Amino acid sequence: MSTASPAMSPFSPRRPACVLCLLAAVLLVLSPGLARADDSMAGDAPAHPGPRAQLSGALRPADIRRAAARVAAWQYARVQDHDSLDWTYAPLYLGFLSAADLLHEPRYADYVRKVGEHYDWGLGPRVHHADDQAVAQAWLVLYARTPDPAMLKPLRERYDAQLRIPDDPQRPLWWWCDALFMAPPTWAGLAKATHESAYLDYMDRQWWITSALLYDPVEYLYSRDASYLHQHERNGEKLFWSRGNGWVMAGLARVLSLMPNDYPQRPRYLQQFHEMAARLAQLQGKDGLWRAGLLDAAAYPRPETSGSAFIVYALAWGVHHGVLDAAAYRSAINRGWRGLVGEIYADGRLGDIQPIGAAPGDYPPGASYVYGVGAFLLAAGEVEAISEAKPR
């Protein structure tokens, strides 16, 4: 935080404190991912997290499951008596559902179901806000396993009302790139569950409105939001946030997994997925992980685990489902997974997860937050599916 000079003190007559307080409050309310994600259970950053676990990062099923089990058990112990509809928990719920299958541990899926039932399968309070729709991804996964119309009722009611709002490319509904993970898979998932294409068509229109605003057709990367379109790193390169692009890659993977193969717009999603995958593979660090700022790695010496985990998840999903060429991406996935496993502490904490934010930043090695753990568990499931002992 900068220090104001006496002449420009926040409490001087030229800058009344009440005006600044009001401005700060407005910015806090308007900023997605910052205003509501104040849940102390979402994570922490201890100064002394203890020793690393020194687990094997080999792409062998037993080693992958061992790493996933260590992380899942640690996180479960911290949240098992807690529930939330906050966006920070959406990746964790998805990760727990994946871990339940990978590890044959029903307690993880039972926990997610308990949360959904507690909230009557509802969503967050902001009706049209992507962050407050994200948890529905987990409800839709559970619905696919045990269909019950009551599980879809809150989502359908909210989305049917939203369908009646005209599109406005000048005021994008999903105006920050993280939103492409939060909301689109819920729309695609609801379309699949109900066999009603209107939900998918709506998602498709909104996706490309956001893409037109934030996607760089030269760098094949997304700016976090329009305020970052002309910001640069210290080395002069454009500023692209690794977790923001990880959100998008994971969102693409999840949308493609739910979208019919014959959907007319599917080739556009595949093209963007291929473009981003190739570019991100070029930017991978020597340790297998990505830095918080993608185009100025030297400015960010620590790896960033949450963005890296989302990227590894998306790449592994692409290989698993024949969307990406295994020969071209297996090395990047292998190195990425080894790097992620190296971030596990002896007690199961997953470190180097950047706290909630909107741009590259600093954090201590032990920083751990639920969205990063969820991304890691999602990656574990897809990496295990293409591991050395699996038929290909």
Name each region found by the language model:
Residues 152-184:
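Asp-box/WD-like beta-propeller blade repeats and closely related beta-sheet repeat scaffolds
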Residues 41-90, 97-118, 122-136, 142-157, ...:
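CBM-like carbohydrate-recognition segments
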Residues 80, 104, 120-124, 147, ...:
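Helix-capping and short linker residues that terminate individual alpha-solenoid repeat units
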